[in-house]
Each structure stands twice: as structure tokens, then as C-alpha cells.
């Protein structure tokens, strides 16, 4: 088992587009310098041209080396998956610009079953999860362009999800309504999490509870407070399951219109009931759909979010403030994170880390999305010496230093359509 990561390292500040822009600028400089050695130029200012010609070979050599370095960096940027995605994106752009190709789909099918949903279902059946990720990301990003006859940016997951709602033919099902608080409870006292494995284990416990539950821990040293929130993933794949606020309908709404999704409303209700003030420090961990909710809560800016941990969540499209340390744990062959429609950003305080999960004979790629596999990955994260991984990990765990657990509350919810 080996980890692959990017982001979280302040020494790495260039994005792929910036690398390409730098390479283009070097090419312009190289062409400009070579153009300075026409015979007529020497007649105008022979001394200066001679001096330039003397130093030109070494300068051009340095430019060529820098171009080569940019090419190598761009070629190895992130992963092969990202490069393949770019190629598939070109294809989807072409189809979006030529909507008549949609006529190839059987009559009536396009208006009843959204392509994004078809792609999602198909992707989960692939044994090669990395192919599934590419399909999912590109389908969600381009779906709005397909159906609207406009070119898609490839990043428009929100529009893609909204089109799923608009065109699914089950409008009453893919609605949203605030879930009802069904009960408030407490769990036995426990110490603050001292590792990513321990934090992810508590997230797994939250997800495995019998009823849809948000768990909130309150820490204090007598002067300052910190709240730790655990958000479960999608618990029901049935959009008609109105008793479940963390179902597939809420997942689609969380992508398209997060503010009114049942799962986000449940999280906000729990925070309010727990007495979390706007100035109280808040660390949020979420699995799958819960990770998306965690990212959206951080992006809203209504609470003092000081840390975010997501596992198997589609969050690349969410604009989380740059000062918040974020750890996104994503398996290379897990299709779910790809439904963000874009890769997570390369940022100083956002690290994306994961591994490729072994898919055995008879299994689908969905095994890589299981919370148990993310628990194993969290254990590897604790052992990692990668600058980006260790830096963000230590920042997150440092939030609990000097604090003791005061109480743990559980908030059960029902409904939410």
C-alpha cells in the first residue's frame, strides 16, 4: 500500500496552467532572441549586437533547459488520469458544440434519464475505478453543455446536477425539505483524536449508526471552545426514501443547490441545537456525501471553520477559503469524488491524498469507496512523511492540543425531501 498526494506544500505553488504559461513565455523569449541576429541588425548597432551574439548561446541553452523542465513538470503533473481526462474533455467539448450528435440517443431517453445518471450507474459497474472516475468527472462537467447545446467548461458539476433534477422526470422525488430532528442523545466520553486513523474511525462509527446521525463533540480548556463534527455519507440509494435525509436525492441537491439540500440543512440544524456560535472554532469531518456538506459549510463562511477532513467526497468544485487546512482523502479508483466535475485545487493548505484500492475478482470499483478502506488509508497517512500530507495532518490534529472533551452529542434526523 502506497500513498500518492499533491497540495499542502507551500514550496509547490505552480498550477498546471501556470507551468504551461511559463513554457509559452520561454518559447516567445527564445524566438525573440533568435530574431535579433539578422544581418541588418548588425549594421544598425554592430558593437551591441556582437556582445549579444557572444552571450546568446549560453542564454539560449538556459532557456532550452527551462523549457525542458517545464515540459517534464507539465507531463508528470498530478497523474496520468489528469492527462487522460484532458483528452476526454476535448471530446466532450466537441459533442457539446455539436448537439445534433445527441440524436444518436434513442428518442425520448435523453429527456427522461439524464446522461449524468446513466454515466454514474455505468461507472459503478466498472472494475477499473480510475476509468470510472474519468467518466464520472467528465459526464458531470459536460452534462449541462450536452443538454443545453452550449460548450461546457468541464467544471460545471452544479449545472450537471441541476440538469439531473430538471430532466429526471421525478421532480417530486428530487425535491428538498428540511429534515426533522428525531432525537438528541449522548455517547460515552472519549479523548480527543490524536491521529487521522482515530478521527476516521469515529467518522466510520457515525456512518454506521442505525439512524441518520450527526455527531458533535465539544472540547474546552476553560477559555476557548472547539467543536468537532462528524457527518455520515449517503445511507440510502433510493430517491423515494423520504425518511432518509442522507439519500441519493440529497446528494444530487448537495451538488446542484447545496444551500437547500436536506443533508446540509440537517448539519446546520445540529450545529444550532448543539449551541455552536459563529465565533466558535469548528473542525468538520465528512464521508462521501457528508464530506461534500463539510466543504460547503466551510465555503459558506457562516461558522468559524478551522479544519476540514473529507473521505471519498466530491469537493473539487467547492471554493473553500484558502486559510482553512483541508485534507481530502480520495482513492484513485473511487468514482464518487469525481462527481465534483474537476480535480481538487493545488493549494498550500489543501492536500489530496490517497491510494489505489485492490479490487478483487467479482467486485466492482465501489469497493474502493467503502469507509473501511478509507480507515486503512488514514493509518497510512499517520505514517506519511510527505511534506504536504504531514503538514496538513499536523495542523488539523494541533487544533485539539490542550483541550479536553466536555460532551458528545448525537442528533438523529428523519425526512428531508
Model-identified regions with their sequence ranges:
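Generic marker of "main functional regions" within proteins
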Residues: 29, 36, 73, 87, ...
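N-terminal secretion-targeting helices of virulence/extracellular proteins
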Residues: 1-97, 417
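Gly/Ala-rich beta-loop-alpha elbow adjacent to hydrolase catalytic centers
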Residues: 285-295
